[in-house]
């Protein structure tokens, strides 16, 4: 008979894998352009945030901090879907304008961060986003200066906590 303590680690891994599969199922299925706001809300529920856009409204469906996805559904002035996209991708992150974008711009494009962090070598906030790159858990950091302007970005692996952390 295998001692229970030896089963704990493999069981934890199975639980993490099953949890990841379940969370992947939380991703929005494609939303058709032309769908109404009411149809989007009926199908996906209340968004995590709404942001005014020059030509309409953005419904944000962010799964931060636990998830690795954030969907942006853009509606025109009449309340019809113009576009829907996953925001937390490398191509989207590359659009960030260093020295030009502000905290407001970042949160409009990516939704709320998973965390707001601080490091000794940086004077401002660091917005932390969890995302997937080809099924690899990643972190994306957005470094803001004291005026809330983006000065730098970075990315790295989202490593699981060690057993005793």
Each language-model region and where it sits:
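Bacterial N-terminal signal peptides that target proteins for export
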Residues: 2-18
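Short alpha-helical interface patches
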Residues: 90-98
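A cross-family detector of function-defining hotspots
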Residues: 32-80, 97-165
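Short aromatic-glycine motifs in intrinsically disordered, low-complexity regions
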Residues: 29-30, 92
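Acidic/histidine-rich, surface-exposed loop or edge segments in extracytoplasmic proteins
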Residues: 81-91
